[in-house]
Amino acid sequence: SSIVVANHPFGLLDGLIICSIICDVRKDYKILINDEVSQIDQIREYLLPIKFSTLTEDIKKNIISKKKAIEHVNSNGILITFPSGEVATSSLIFNEANERRWKPLIGSIINKTNATIIPVRFFGKNSLLFHTIGFVNNNLRRILFIRELLNKKNQTFKLSIGKKILSLQNERLNNRQIVDKLRSIVVNIN
């Protein structure tokens, strides 16, 4: 069983790229994904939706997805995750886009499995327009996700797969420590 942890510079495209690589080798993968993009019928069977909200109904749905993720990994499946939960963004218009702090949910899943962790780093970022709009209003930025997907047509993308991590269970880290450690590993992959 394996858990892929990756940075998230582009949005939907990151997931499409990883899924296209993995599905050439194995079909038993699931992707932990933002609920907003989990409505695509053709791929719904591969998706475990997560909603980043404090509403009771959303928390209940997240618990179900987390349980399914743990069961999937413990059944020797592959789980693909983008632990930041949102696309990398720039704090100032002309600065580099930075990966947000990772959510401890992935640490919780790792602590309940004995999965091999596969760190993946994507290189690149979305357009200046995307980051400029995000600087003005993060909700407006969401409108540009499809544009960002389409404007990358016929481009080549660079990603690197880091050294696999056989287990973190011996280190006795809490969920936050796990994701902080893995984030550091991913953003430092060359």
Over which residues does each language-model region extend?
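Non-catalytic C-terminal accessory region of glycerolipid acyltransferases
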Residues: 63-190
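Generic detector of short, locally flexible boundary/turn motifs and exposed helical patches
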Residues: 1, 12-15, 43-48, 82-86, ...
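Catalytic core of membrane glycerolipid acyltransferases/transacylases, capturing the structured
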Residues: 3-58
